[in-house]
């Protein structure tokens, strides 16, 4: 972009001459700009016309002229960035920001949060880390999961606050007597983000790929065949009834991507730009459901965000503030909730070092010591777990004191960061009982394999739970390599048989009851124990409306809205009727 190049040239000039008047020749300027003297004259004239410098020449070749830089590069960069953002030129703004990435946060601060720019409501979110590739079959991060669920549609979907699957690409579905045939009826006039018509044949191609993919196959293991009996009907024939199927088709691994262009979806927002410093979403004009109120959402990746308190930035992944720096004083928590998901401790009985009784003894020590209540983590961030889900009580372990712990145990943990404090506390506690705890860290957000899990006796990690908690926990047992890694062969076989029995129960309350009973067995045996929940919170300035927390601790991009910039607005305004 020519403007960015010109600013870069001016920055080079300012670095060498400063802001004091300087006597200089055109030849010297040409050397600074790496150009001809003729071009240097043109460039100086342009910079003077823009008010960036003053230039007083003298007649005669080789005569020195008086030059003075009138503005600092930082001032110009901020001014130009504002102009580009107001014009909606996000690509130009990104190029401008890349000139000085170390000060990106300072540059962006006045433009973050909800703003009307180029006539459209835009939300800019500062984010503290680079985002993963937005592929539903590979991503692991909480922010990425939220983004992908915004970009891609499924045959069904899970809405914020609603645990039952809702229509999405399919407007209705039917289940045969016996549950072996499911038909999903597609909406007409569906469109991909690139404007191309979305066809049943394309969805069939995508589903056939998902049937064989290691990430999605566990969710679709009961599917014998997928067919297209009509252009607007997807048919699933099962070899075993699976009354979770409508839930499964709304999960991330089963979202529908374009069969030939996987980055293209059919969700409410499309991916307009995906750069290391900027991810930009734009409203999908051909979306088949109610359109979002916001037109554009931008993630500006600013790893050097200032930390001025737990609620002042996105540095902590369970604290999100929507707004610019000047708004932070006005920003108030608009939504708070305790996560249904939790960080957990898993015992690897398959490894053979810990017996079930020793595992129960270890859990008893943790519970009786109050370890989780005394972690050096603010109470506003975590809450010790007493239930796996509401009503699924974590049992208190009681075992004879004379059961000795092994002399040495190995613990493997992965993010989030709070788990590091748990490992330190565990080392101290177990040392008091003659057990040395070796701690290893894995930087990934998902266990890689059974071989990785086999290295450890104890495992610490977190488990996100979505809008349909019971369905999420059932899928966790199927999809996470943790279970095959920690369960003995007989327990693993028992788990598979239990899941097959549960999925065939047509009555949802019965499925929930049986699933709870199985998890109660796992917790009683100390195989899995939730440790603490997160306290999710979103803060926003008064002008942002409709900010609603999702189960994963983000907010529903389709519900947030921003009033247009009128002089006066009535108090207590409500969003327009749909």
Language model region names:
Residues 130-144, 196, 246-251, 539-558:
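A structural "hinge/loop" feature
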Residues 58, 361-395, 421-425, 454-578:
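Detector for C-terminal structural segments
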Residues 22-27, 33-39, 51-57, 399-462:
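Ligand/substrate-recognition segments at binding pockets and active sites
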Residues 282-285, 335-361:
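A bilobed periplasmic-binding-protein/Venus flytrap-type ligand-binding module shared by bacterial periplasmic
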């Amino acid at each position: 972009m020519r403007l960015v190049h010109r600013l870069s040239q001016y920055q080079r000039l300012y670095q060498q001459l400063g802001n004091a008047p300087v006597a200089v020749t055109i030849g010297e300027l040409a050397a600074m700009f790496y150009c001809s003297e003729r071009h240097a004259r043109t460039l100086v004239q342009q910079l003077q016309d823009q008010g960036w410098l003053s230039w007083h020449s003298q007649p005669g070749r080789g005569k020195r002229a008086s030059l003075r830089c009138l503005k600092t590069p930082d001032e110009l960069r901020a001014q130009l960035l504002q102009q580009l953002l107001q014009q909606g030129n996000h690509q130009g703004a990104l190029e401008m920001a890349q000139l000085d990435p170390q000060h990106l946060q300072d540059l962006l601060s006045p433009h973050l949060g909800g703003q009307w720019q180029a006539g459209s409501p835009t939300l800019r979110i500062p984010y503290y880390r680079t985002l993963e590739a937005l592929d539903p079959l590979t991503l692991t991060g909480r922010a990425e999961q939220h983004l992908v669920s915004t970009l891609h549609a499924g045959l069904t979907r899970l809405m914020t606050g609603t645990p039952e699957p809702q229509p999405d690409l399919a407007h209705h579905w039917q289940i045969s007597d016996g549950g072996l045939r499911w038909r999903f009826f597609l909406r007409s006039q569906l469109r991909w983000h690139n404007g191309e018509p979305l066809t049943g044949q394309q969805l069939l191609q995508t589903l056939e790929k998902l049937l064989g993919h290691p990430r999605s196959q566990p969710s679709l293991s009961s599917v014998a065949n997928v067919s297209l009996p009509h252009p607007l009907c997807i048919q699933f024939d099962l070899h075993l009834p699976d009354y979770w199927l409508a839930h499964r088709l709304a999960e991330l691994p089963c979202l529908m991507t374009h069969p030939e262009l996987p980055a293209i979806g059919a969700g409410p927002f499309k991916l307009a730009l995906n750069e290391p410093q900027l991810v930009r979403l734009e409203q999908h004009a051909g979306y088949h459901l109610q359109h979002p109120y916001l037109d554009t959402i931008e993630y500006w990746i600013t790893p050097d965000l200032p930390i001025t308190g737990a609620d002042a930035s996105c540095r902590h992944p369970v604290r999100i503030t929507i707004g610019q720096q000047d708004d932070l004083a006005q920003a108030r928590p608009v939504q708070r909730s305790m996560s249904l998901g939790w960080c957990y401790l898993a015992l690897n009985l398959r490894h053979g070092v810990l017996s079930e009784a020793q595992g129960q003894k270890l859990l008893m020590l943790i519970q009786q010591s109050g370890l989780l209540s005394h972690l050096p983590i603010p109470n506003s961030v975590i809450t010790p777990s007493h239930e796996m889900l509401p009503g699924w009580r974590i049992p208190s372990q009681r075992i004879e004191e004379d059961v000795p712990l092994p002399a040495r145990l190995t613990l493997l943990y992965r993010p989030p960061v709070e788990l590091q404090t748990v490992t330190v506390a565990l080392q101290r506690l177990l040392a008091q009982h003659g057990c040395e705890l070796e701690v290893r860290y894995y930087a990934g957000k998902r266990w890689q394999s059974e071989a990785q899990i086999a290295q450890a006796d104890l495992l610490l990690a977190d488990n996100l739970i979505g809008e349909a908690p019971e369905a999420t926990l059932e899928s966790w047992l199927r999809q996470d390599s943790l279970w095959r890694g920690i369960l003995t062969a007989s327990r693993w076989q028992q788990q598979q048989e239990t899941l097959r029995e549960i999925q065939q129960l047509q009555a949802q309350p019965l499925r929930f009851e049986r699933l709870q009973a199985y998890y109660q067995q796992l917790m009683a045996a100390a195989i899995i124990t939730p440790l603490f929940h997160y306290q999710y919170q979103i803060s926003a300035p008064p002008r942002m409306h409709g900010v609603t927390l999702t189960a994963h601790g983000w907010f529903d991009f389709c519900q947030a809205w921003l009033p247009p910039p009128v002089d006066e607005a009535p108090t207590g305004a409500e969003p327009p009727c749909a």
